[in-house]
């Protein structure tokens, strides 16, 4: 009776697996499409778990020899190492991000990373538990143990897929500066990206501007500079002209003063000489008149 019950359970589980497995398999390509190193490593782990889930004779043999858990441990370590490396690379790229935003995103990413690691750890522990149960066989048949393991593996693979997708989304958000909206506090990043886009658009417009327009702009600038220099030269010339007028006025004033002084010096001398000359002429005329004899009268 127990054997029949076990066969019935295995049949039902196999039917459930047949219904659930295509849905799970259909989701796989969307997970690893970008091909990041951590995704490729997780893909190898995923393929290995799919092979383990077949519970073939080889799988059973390797489960009992702990080879499966050892191989799974290596794949887990490789996956987590690639995740950490990719996260470190993103942190370097997003160093200019605001500290509070970067801390919030990093915390969310670490939580998703921890969930993925816990899922893989649970799978490994469950496989180790199965090996112990098979070795003990405490009142259970091998079919029952395999059925229970298959059921657990399906559930854990679904959980692993869900958490892997969540980690992938958060890494994409981290890489894009949290594009999912203001609820993640990334408005500053969007403003910075918008500013960079606007600067790029302006730079592109200036680069594609016709040469004639750019030459005209340079000509306007040069003309303005020449007018400025010419205005400064005219102002300087006016200052020099005013200074020359002041010098000329001073020279004329000094010349007039000197002329007045000369006139004051020589006019008395000239007047005295004129007076002396007039006296001399008068004396000569008197002397000439006195020496001339009077004319004789005839009878």
UniProtKB/Swiss-Prot annotation:
Where is the secretion signal located? 1-18
- Ligand binding (heparin): 156-159, 219-226
According to the record, where are the sequence repeats?
74-95, 96-117, 118-139, 140-161, 162-183, 184-205, 224-245
Protein's GO biological process = acylglycerol homeostasis; cholesterol efflux; cholesterol metabolic process; lipoprotein metabolic process; melanosome organization; phospholipid efflux
Where is the region LDL and other lipoprotein receptors binding? 152-162
* A Pfam family of this chain: Apolipoprotein
How is the protein altered post-translationally, as described in the entry?
Answer: APOE exists as multiple glycosylated and sialylated glycoforms within cells and in plasma. The extent of glycosylation and sialylation are tissue and context specific. Glycated in plasma VLDL.
Provide the protein's localization. Answer: Secreted; Secreted, Extracellular space; Secreted, Extracellular space, Extracellular matrix; Extracellular vesicle
Record region (Lipid-binding and lipoprotein association): 204-273
Give positions of region: Specificity for association with VLDL: 261-273
Q: In the record, which positions carry Phosphoserine?
A: 141
Give the main location. Answer: secreted
Q: Which GO terms describe its molecular function?
A: cholesterol transfer activity; heparin binding; phosphatidylcholine-sterol O-acyltransferase activator activity; phospholipid binding
A cellular-component GO term for this protein: high-density lipoprotein particle
Residues that bear Methionine sulfoxide: 137
UniProt KW keywords: Chylomicron, Endosome, Extracellular matrix, Glycoprotein, HDL, Heparin-binding, Lipid transport, Lipid-binding, Oxidation, Phosphoprotein, Repeat, Secreted, Signal, Transport, VLDL
Q: Where is this region: 8 X 22 AA approximate tandem repeats?
A: 74-245
Q: Could you list the residue ranges that cross the membrane?
A: none
* Membership in a protein family: Belongs to the apolipoprotein A1/A4/E family.
Q: What does this protein do?
A: APOE is an apolipoprotein, a protein associating with lipid particles, that mainly functions in lipoprotein-mediated lipid transport between organs via the plasma and interstitial fluids. APOE is a core component of plasma lipoproteins and is involved in their production, conversion and clearance. Apolipoproteins are amphipathic molecules that interact both with lipids of the lipoprotein particle core and the aqueous environment of the plasma.
Q: How does it assemble?
A: Homotetramer. May interact with ABCA1; functionally associated with ABCA1 in the biogenesis of HDLs. May interact with APP/A4 amyloid-beta peptide; the interaction is extremely stable in vitro but its physiological significance is unclear. May interact with MAPT. May interact with MAP2. In the cerebrospinal fluid, interacts with secreted SORL1. Interacts with PMEL; this allows the loading of PMEL luminal fragment on ILVs to induce fibril nucleation.
Name the UniProt record assigns to this protein: Apolipoprotein E
The species this protein belongs to is Erethizon dorsatum
Name of the gene this protein is made from: APOE
């Amino acid at each position: 009776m127990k054997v029949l019950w076990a066969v019935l359970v295995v049949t039902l589980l196999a039917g459930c697996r047949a219904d659930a497995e295509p849905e799970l398999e259909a989701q796989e390509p969307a997970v690893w499409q970008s091909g990041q190193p951590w995704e490729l490593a997780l893909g190898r782990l995923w393929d290995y778990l799919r092979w383990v889930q077949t519970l073939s004779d080889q799988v059973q043999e390797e489960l009992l020899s702990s080879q499966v858990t050892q191989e799974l441990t290596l794949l887990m370590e490789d996956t987590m190492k690639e995740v950490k490396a990719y996260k470190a690379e993103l942190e370097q790229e997003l160093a200019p991000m605001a500290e509070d935003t970067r801390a919030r995103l990093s915390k969310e990413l670490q939580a998703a990373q921890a969930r993925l690691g816990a899922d893989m750890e649970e799978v490994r522990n469950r496989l180790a538990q199965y090996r112990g149960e098979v070795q003990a066989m405490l009142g259970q048949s091998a079919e029952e143990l395999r059925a229970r393991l298959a059921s657990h593996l399906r559930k854990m693979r679904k959980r692993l897929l869900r958490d892997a997708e969540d980690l992938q989304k958060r890494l994409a958000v981290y890489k894009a500066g949290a594009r999912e909206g203001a609820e993640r506090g990334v408005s500053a990043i969007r403003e910075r990206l918008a500013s960079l886009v606007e600067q790029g658009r302006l730079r592109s417009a200036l680069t594609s501007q016709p040469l004639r327009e750019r030459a005209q702009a340079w000509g306007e600038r040069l003309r303005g500079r020449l007018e400025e220099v010419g205005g400064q030269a005219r102002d300087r010339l006016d200052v020099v002209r005013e200074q020359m007028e002041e010098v000329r006025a001073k020279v004329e004033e000094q010349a007039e003063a000197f002329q007045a002084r000369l006139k004051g010096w020589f006019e008395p001398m000239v007047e005295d000489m004129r007076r002396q000359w007039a006296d001399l002429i008068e004396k000569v005329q008197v002397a000439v008149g006195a020496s001339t004899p009077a004319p004789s009268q005839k009878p």
